[in-house]
């Protein structure tokens, strides 16, 4: 088991962990008003860049 040789300061520990944060997911809103991921078809209406790209079952 690895054991540290010297104590790491709070500052150095914080600098090491500075890149460990969770990225906030990017959200854009479709013309229908639903949130969706950028560069992907809208899961609710099936449009992408103003075109219908997937079939949607309207029940």
Swiss-Prot record:
GO terms for biological process: translation. InterPro entries: Ribosomal_bL32, Ribosomal_bL32_bact, Ribosomal_zn-bd. Residues 1-20 are annotated as: Disordered. GO terms for cellular component: large ribosomal subunit. Keywords: Ribonucleoprotein, Ribosomal protein. HAMAP family: Ribosomal_bL32. This is Large ribosomal subunit protein bL32.
